[in-house]
Amino acid sequence: MPERTSAHDPALLLFGSDNRYVSECQDCGGRVSNAAMMGANILKLKPVIELKDGQLICAEKIRGSDYRRLCIKLIREKLDAFPPDLQDVALVRTPGLEADICEAIEAELRQRGFQNVRWHEAGGVITAHGGPGVFGFAFSEIRRRYGRSLP
């Protein structure tokens, strides 16, 4: 019988950053070297930050210039990899995330069957470290009695 994990223990917490702002925010704060910033901008790389074992890590980098399409792609990949409990999904944004991107993200999640889709504004720490235009989401994964994911 599937059981829901606690809302305080999300299976996945992801943040993706629109690197149009990397040079303005992350470089100024010293979090990204000039070489890394230039390489990310040339290759159009956007970092995906995951919360694993209580630490924020750069799990992957996705490539492309259409941030809206990349956000939808990220959602699809993660929901396919981790079967979600379709009750709730929490979405986080920093100022600068365009309204059409927010609407596309919400439409994708509702189409996937999520019942409660809630947006939250990121606090000062996430905004200062990620910069404008950051999108994040968290959901609970459905697990079997012994902790294995459903097929």
Please name every model-derived segment.
Residues 1-151:
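Mixed-charge interfacial surface used for oligomerization/domain docking
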